[in-house]
Amino acid sequence: MRTYPIKTSLFLAAGVTLAAMGAAAQSTPQRSLLALSKRDHTLAIVDPGTLQVIARAPVGPDPHEVIASSDGKTAYVSIYGGGRYHALSVIDLVGQKALPDVDTGALNGPHGLATVSEKILFTAEGAKAIAIYDPATSKIDWIMGTGQNRTHMVYITPDQKQIYTTNVSSATVSILEKVTLPPMGPPPGARPPQGAQGSPPPGPPPGGGQPRMDWSETVIPVGKGDEGFDVSPDGRELWTADAQDGTLSVIDLASRKVLATLDAKATGANRLKFTPDGKLALISRLGDGDLMVYDTASRKEFKRVHIGHGAAGILMDKEGGRAFIACGPDNYVAVVDLKTLSVTGHIDVGGEPDGLAWATRQ
């Protein structure tokens, strides 16, 4: 089994405190901005009101994405390693300390994250799969293969009946839908029972019992290198940022068809997020200092906002009317006002920031 360096694992498992990292102790706000540093291997806890980092905690090497538990007390970080590593780092946000890692075993390359009630949904690139970890039992209790290469980012609908993933190297989007299947019939080769005068007996097929739940997958081809994506606030459309083609693919979720392929010339596009009102889509690019802004109604570029020398993670702030953009080459998170579409501040969260998330303590 592949592992990352043992010193890091022991460092995390020991529950290292913020005092050990030389940080002054401050209470974690009820609502916190979480930001990863890929270079420093840390998670920063930021006060969104003051934009000050109040604490940092260690995570494993090559951290990419972060998400908070539904109660806002714990953070989970995917330790990616280009598909080699197999761990989720765990941070106690109240105690501001690292907890023992979650070993994902053969589910190598965890990356995209989402919450499913009290559980954590994650992609596993190396296994071409998605899976769910249950913190209550400390077990992975569900795995579903996609059959696609580099299953990277993931989204689950609010009713938890559909899951969407981008599959970078297959240039596809997977739509996994929860379906109910009829009872199974008798085993192969078994002689079916006969009803009156040789007719089939009434009722469901024998041998199968009750209807059962399963998942049905629809695979939709999109532009090459699709990675970042988002679902419109009304749930009608899914847009992907296709890094290799430089295009944006627009999928109608009702028909499950590509409505449009926009020639955005967005080579290297890494993330795409809709504004809370759904009127704009923001696209970050790894090798370009401008944040692209698209009008979703016309599906045309609306503006570009200079934010630095390249960017990755995007996080919307519905309460504050802001977007936070992780600018890796510049070692800061840019704060963008969504009304003026201008940069209003920067946050030093550590070297090469990437994954961003909210934690709201219940």
Model-derived regions: residue spans:
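Predominantly soluble domains enriched in secretory-pathway, periplasmic, or organellar proteins
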Residues: 4-5, 15-362
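Bacterial N-terminal signal peptides that target proteins for export
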Residues: 1-11
